[in-house]
Amino acid sequence: MDFVTTLRTRPDLFDRLNRAVTLERAAQWFVRIADTYAPSQTARYTRGRVMREILKESGAARDMVFHDNLWQTGSVALELGGQPAKPFWLLAHLDITSYALDVHVGGRYRLFPLCYHMSRSGRHAAVALAFAPGGVGGQVIATGEIVTEEDGAEVFFETSVTSLPKGTRIVYHYPTQIDWNRHMVYGNIDNAFGATALLLAAVAIAPYSPDALFAFPDEEEGQTGAGNQAFCKGSARLFHRCPHDRFPAAVLACDVHESMDMVDGPGARFAVPGQGATYCELSSRGRGGVTPPPLVNFHREFARFLADHGIKLQENRDGYVSRSDSVSAMLFLQNIALIGYLGAHRHFDATPEANLTDLVHLAKTVGVYALVAQDPQWQAQFA
């Protein structure tokens, strides 16, 4: 594909990306999003409000339409361009791993995971949240620890507060820490990293008015062992409720790719943290989204073009990639791009980590991708 010709009407694109997507801005926006608790079913009231504030402060709100509940799906979305139909969608879920409180027995509360519980044993700092009517953010009503028994089958919340109502949401408490010497980020990376990347990209390319939808679904987290319909509920609603004449030609699903060995598979060996964004061909060994071979070849060609402009996009050839919102998209279209970032311990079997440099490369990658996807030649191949 002739990328130079495709992007010829945007000669200042890469200078614009370098100005809009910096390490400092990426870190600031990530911290604000990641350190906002957003258990499933609350994302638009919590992180959605933070994103709206960021857009207003940056002056970018005038260049896009902000939705805090697109099509009544619970999803936050940024709509760019003037056409009702958006040929290219980008998805990065906004909710975090969370648990629902059960009864208080033996001095602690049993928990029901509303996520894929990956910790096999140990204790992790946690908080209990209450949400008042009217869509306001969560209030911390108790502090304590999420405790997992040795076999990982039982999980509890231990706190000095004994009067919490059943169903109270419990989340891990890991305020962001940044090692600026190594550009390592520790904290709630899944999927604040992906959401921040899409937000940065949308702000950077919005003045070009591409017809693209940047969507941030709620309720991606869920009990994956029950099958594809037990999680990614927010993105499933997006596709079901989207007007039929507005379906995209392609979807990019952005989430964490494993950088270390974990319970479901090996970490990446070929791709390296700190060396850019990553793309892969399939998720969850084919149980999730699968990228068609022609689109995989496009990604290889695209990565070479980006490299000429200092943007790094690595092929993740051997690392395990979990299912994400691609499981919703794959029931409606074939062209699914799995582009994300390397991270470890995403569901708190240890302290989650990722590399801030990769966030910058990821934001630039998806921004350029959204513009390339406007090209009639590209759409003719992948529509």
PLM feature spans:
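N-terminal hydrophobic/helix-forming segments and targeting peptides
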Residues: 1-383
